[in-house]
Amino acid sequence: MDDTPDIKLPYLFRVSVEKVRAKLTGRERALFDLLCVAGHLGRSLPNSNSNRRTVSGARDPRKQLLRLAARMDGTTEEWDAASARMLNVVIRELTRHDKEEPYRALRVLLGNASIALAPDCVVPRDASLLVAWKTVVALFARLYRSTIKPLGRLSWIDEQQLAMLKRETARGRTRGRHASGMRPGRAGRTLAVDPRLMRAVGKALGLSASPGYQARYIFYTRDGDYFWPHPDDPEYAVNVLVCLDHRRPARGPGSALLAYRPDGSVERYELAPGSALAVEARGLVHAREPMRRGERMTVLSINVKAV
């Protein structure tokens, strides 16, 4: 990538980046370059141990992005127009080459841009980074559906069932954030394929839902544990998040799931134990707010397919 900071993308990324970049000029190309650099920085962060401390101070990827953005002159209107033109080209190429691995890699790279642009879950204030942010949020909202619906308390999860699920997570809660991704035991696996859950998801989102046979426990066990903004893997249409345990902070509101919209707005969704959210997460850039002092949380993440 000429005329951009010296970053070395893996070959699989370079193939599609260079082909798409060749179709862009002027501000559209500059914006695409900024997103690719942001994606490279985002994918380099420690995904398995995300805590606010890992991206603070000198490790904040926005420092490098701001140096690049300082070279980007033009009015807000000009950059908004460039964003719209760039989006049309990128969406056309990603859709046309949907089954090709280099373009799947490009989609991952651009999704990772949201991490570097808002590593603290706060929408950028710098004008250039804000345009880039809105662009990447709009990209995934146009590629896929991006609805999010609270399912409320799941009526079939009584206190006994909730206690069984919490017992399954005991080892993971002891290990902490590193244990995130742990496969559930029998109770969690049963919930992940429960027909009642599929019906609730389908009714909430207006689709026919079937089990994805993929579920993971997520643990937030330290102050500052969180998950930065990202869209999910496109393999699954829906991600259901079931709260199993939430020790709230002594003061202030608890951590919420954040849903970002292309206009720069942010929606907050809090979960109580036993309640769930249905998220069309491959089209929705979303994040988990950092745990506040004394706050702890355990979530079961369930992948669901749309049929």
Residue ranges of predicted features:
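Non-heme Fe(II)/2-oxoglutarate
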Residues: 6-62, 73-84, 91-207
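A structural signal for short, well-ordered beta-strand segments and their strand-loop junctions
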Residues: 153-156, 211-212, 278-279, 301
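A short coil-to-beta-strand element that immediately follows conserved catalytic motifs
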Residues: 206-216
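Catalytic core of non-heme Fe(II) oxygenases with the double-stranded beta-helix
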Residues: 220-284, 295-299, 306
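Short proline/glycine-enriched turn/loop segments at secondary-structure junctions
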Residues: 287-293
